[in-house]
């Protein structure tokens, strides 16, 4: 066997071997969120949040049936890597159950937009990888234009086709090349693009979502993916997070899954039958809709409900944040969320963050106000704060979400 045959054999083993458990995995890494990045550089996040909520409201008033992706990416902390093209071009993407489209910045991104300029890296230390079709031998032109309204801004571009590799699975995929990218939040993000894990009905570009492409090709053990976020960044034998395609990993949870059927076709929405402090049900006595969203970090809810919850806890609202003296954080009570009669409980160590660099002895609660108007809202969003505590299984075949206590 000559050297080229040896190289080919080694390459095939690395890229096409099938794991013994039949599952494919995407390692997730933790990053500095946009919120943290702005705080470090003394930028005014409060004004951004006011503009962001105003933007959602304006869209709903323009068209009551307008579809808006409600994920607030400014607090997103986890990303994974995907490869596009031949040879591969690597991108950091947020895997988002709140949307269904897949896009990355294009090398043809309009320099009139600040987020497309390389000079952005000098001020915010953010460098975005851009897809260059001319460097890929497997690229195919599509050219269809698309526009996606996120709660935090709008991206625009055109569709292209190329080989995409995710979690060891390679396939031909249509995706978006973004040429219009707003500075807030995407220009300041540590990630490059978004890979939606929502249902096909959520796709605003009209393309077949990545997960559905995998299903159609029969490469998954089950029509399921599961999400793990490490609860302890110092836990060296586990990654910061992982998405398991085709099933679940028993090393990431204890006990069994409790399943909740989705409440709205085409959405990862479930009915929440109560929010309680200790055993006292304070909110959602008559049911609320909750979205389990891997693209979000905090737990968000309608302003009136969130303020009632925080007031009961004795927590003060400062600007756009809920803060408490760190010395008092351990005294905060448990908060429970009820699904189909079962309580999923967070204690204070699950929902309070301490900034070790802060000099004011104030800790941040990972709750936030978010008023989403009809027809999508009102809506609660359960982000990483919840998923870190409960390993989450998204079951497309049975249209349900399962929760198990994470390790």
Task: Go through each PLM region and give its residues.
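Aspartic protease catalytic domain
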Residues: 2-37, 44, 74-76, 85-87, ...
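Signature of the N-terminal lobe/flap region of pepsin-like aspartyl proteases
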Residues: 60-69, 73-190, 322, 336, ...
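Acidic glycine-/aspartate-rich tracts in secreted/extracellular proteins
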Residues: 108-110, 201, 249-251, 305
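Charged, amphipathic alpha-helical segments
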Residues: 143-147, 207-213, 312-325
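C-terminal reverse transcriptase regions that engage the nucleic-acid substrate
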Residues: 196
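Extended, H/D-rich, highly charged conserved domains that either
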Residues: 199, 219-232, 236-246
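Flexible, small-/acidic-enriched active-site or ligand-binding loops
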Residues: 238-287
């Amino acid at each position: 066997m000559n050297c080229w045959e040896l190289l080919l054999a080694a390459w095939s083993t690395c890229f096409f071997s099938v794991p013994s458990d039949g599952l494919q995995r995407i390692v997730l890494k933790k990053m500095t969120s946009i919120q943290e990045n702005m705080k470090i550089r003394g930028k005014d996040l409060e004004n951004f949040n006011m503009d962001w909520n105003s933007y959602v409201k304006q869209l709903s008033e323009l068209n009551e049936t307008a579809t808006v992706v409600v994920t607030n990416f400014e607090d997103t902390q986890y990303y994974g890597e995907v490869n596009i093209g031949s040879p591969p071009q690597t991108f950091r993407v947020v895997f988002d159950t709140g949307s269904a489209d897949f896009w990355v910045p294009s090398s043809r991104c309009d320099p009139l937009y600040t987020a497309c300029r390389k000079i952005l890296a000098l001020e915010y230390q953010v460098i975005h990888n851009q897809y260059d079709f001319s460097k890929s031998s497997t690229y195919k032109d599509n050219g269809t234009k698309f526009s996606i309204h996120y709660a935090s801004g709008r991206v625009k571009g055109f569709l292209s086709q190329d080989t995409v590799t995710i979690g060891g699975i390679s396939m031909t995929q249509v995706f978006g090349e973004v040429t219009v990218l707003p500075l807030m939040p995407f220009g300041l993000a540590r990630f490059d693009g978004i890979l939606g894990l929502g249902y096909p009905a959520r796709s605003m570009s009209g393309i077949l979502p990545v997960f559905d492409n995998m299903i159609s090709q029969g490469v998954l053990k089950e029509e399921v993916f599961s999400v793990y976020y490490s609860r302890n960044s110092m836990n060296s034998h586990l990654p910061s997070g992982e998405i398991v395609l085709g099933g679940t990993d028993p090393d990431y949870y204890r006990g069994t899954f409790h399943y909740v059927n989705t409440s709205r076709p085409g959405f990862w929405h479930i009915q929440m039958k109560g929010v309680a402090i200790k055993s006292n049900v304070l909110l959602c006595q008559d049911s609320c809709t909750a979205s389990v969203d891997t693209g979000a970090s905090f737990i968000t809810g309608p302003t009136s409900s969130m303020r009632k919850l925080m007031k009961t806890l004795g927590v003060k609202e400062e600007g756009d944040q809920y803060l408490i003296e760190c010395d008092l954080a351990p005294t905060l009570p448990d908060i429970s969320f009820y699904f189909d009669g079962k309580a999923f409980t967070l204690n204070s160590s699950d929902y309070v963050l301490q900034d070790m660099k802060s000099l004011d002895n104030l800790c941040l609660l990972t709750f936030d106000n978010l008023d989403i108007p009809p027809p999508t809202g009102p809506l609660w969003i359960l982000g990483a704060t919840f998923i870190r505590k409960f390993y989450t299984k998204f079951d497309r075949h049975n249209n349900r979400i399962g929760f198990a206590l994470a390790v």
